[in-house]
Design a protein with these regions (language model features):
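C-terminal target-recognition/interaction regions appended to catalytic cores
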Residues: 1-157
Length: 157
């Protein structure tokens, strides 16, 4: 695939959701699973927040870069809650992923993880510039939702 797509091995279905989005297929490789660089300030913020906590948390008040603008950046930093639905995946992830901090690791979600939230199968890969993949994923209609809408429309055709 060249230098634009990261390829990782994958051992199979970890849960029912992965089985569903992959149509019960075992997919040996995943694509676009590379985390973004995290600078020192964001590393500390990511480390200090617990799942479900955001930029308004007192633990990060002294290092929060947007503390004087919390009224407009209150959702700037958010650590996802494990085993709960994700926040909405948006094209803004192209700019930064602070609104989707991984619940266990000190990093933001990868394009592959964002694509999984949008129900893209693991063998779907995004070509092109790394940050563009976040925009493509954020602008997409979730695959499973599109399938359900198509099923209903088909009944009336």
């Amino acid at each position: 695939f060249g230098k634009k797509v990261d390829v990782n091995s994958f051992s199979g279905h970890d849960n029912d959701y992965l089985s569903l989005i992959n149509d019960k297929r075992t997919i040996p490789l995943t694509y676009n699973h590379k985390a973004r660089y995290v600078n020192d300030i964001n590393y500390d913020i990511y480390r200090l927040l617990n799942p479900g906590e955001d930029a308004s948390n007192e633990k990060i008040a002294d290092i929060m870069p947007y503390k004087n603008r919390l009224h407009c950046f209150k959702d700037k930093y958010y650590k996802l809650i494990p085993d709960r639905p994700s926040r909405t995946i948006t094209a803004h992830l192209r700019m930064d992923c602070h609104s989707h901090i991984h619940p266990y690791q000190i990093r933001a979600i990868t394009p592959r993880e964002a694509a999984r939230c949008q129900s893209f199968p693991d063998d779907y890969f995004f070509l092109g510039a790394y940050l563009k993949t976040y925009m493509e994923i954020g602008n997409a209609v979730p695959v499973l939702m599109a399938k359900q809408i198509a099923k209903i429309i088909k009944q009336y055709i």
